[in-house]
């Protein structure tokens, strides 16, 4: 039962991160912030930028 609850919480956290516009590094970060920006625009956001300790996460706004 604990395993199921933990799995549910992890899925919920992941879904919230996606909903907040955090997308993993495959969208140009950290080397090409313009690619991140264009990706975010392509999904209906106003743009995006690379964030995190090593700027590996594309955050859409």
UniProtKB/Swiss-Prot annotation:
<feature type="disulfide bond">
    <location>
        <begin position="40"/>
        <end position="60"/>
    </location>
</feature>
<keyword id="KW-0044">Antibiotic</keyword>
<keyword id="KW-0872">Ion channel impairing toxin</keyword>
<feature type="disulfide bond">
    <location>
        <begin position="36"/>
        <end position="58"/>
    </location>
</feature>
<keyword id="KW-1015">Disulfide bond</keyword>
<dbReference type="GO" id="GO:0005576">
    <property type="term" value="C:extracellular region"/>
</dbReference>
<dbReference type="GO" id="GO:0045087">
    <property type="term" value="P:innate immune response"/>
</dbReference>
<keyword id="KW-0929">Antimicrobial</keyword>
<dbReference type="GO" id="GO:0015459">
    <property type="term" value="F:potassium channel regulator activity"/>
</dbReference>
<dbReference type="GO" id="GO:0042742">
    <property type="term" value="P:defense response to bacterium"/>
</dbReference>
<feature type="signal peptide">
    <location>
        <begin position="1"/>
        <end position="25"/>
    </location>
</feature>
<keyword id="KW-1221">Calcium-activated potassium channel impairing toxin</keyword>
<dbReference type="InterPro" id="IPR001542">
    <property type="entry name" value="Defensin_invertebrate/fungal"/>
</dbReference>
<keyword id="KW-0964">Secreted</keyword>
<keyword id="KW-0732">Signal</keyword>
<comment type="similarity">
    <text>Belongs to the invertebrate defensin family. Type 2 subfamily.</text>
</comment>
<dbReference type="Pfam" id="PF01097">
    <property type="entry name" value="Defensin_2"/>
</dbReference>
<keyword id="KW-0211">Defensin</keyword>
<feature type="disulfide bond">
    <location>
        <begin position="29"/>
        <end position="50"/>
    </location>
</feature>
<protein>
    <recommendedName>
        <fullName>Defensin BmKDfsin1</fullName>
    </recommendedName>
</protein>
<dbReference type="InterPro" id="IPR036574">
    <property type="entry name" value="Scorpion_toxin-like_sf"/>
</dbReference>
<keyword id="KW-0391">Immunity</keyword>
<keyword id="KW-1220">Voltage-gated potassium channel impairing toxin</keyword>
<keyword id="KW-0800">Toxin</keyword>
<keyword id="KW-0399">Innate immunity</keyword>
<comment type="function">
    <text>Antibacterial peptide active against Gram-positive bacteria, but not on Gram-negative bacteria. Also has weak blocking activity on Kv1.1/KCNA1, Kv1.2/KCNA2, Kv1.3/KCNA3, KCa3.1/KCNN4/IK, KCa2.3/KCNN3/SK3 and Kv11.1/KCNH2/ERG1 channels (tested at 1 uM). It inhibits potassium channel current by interacting with the pore region.</text>
</comment>
<keyword id="KW-0632">Potassium channel impairing toxin</keyword>
<dbReference type="GO" id="GO:0090729">
    <property type="term" value="F:toxin activity"/>
</dbReference>
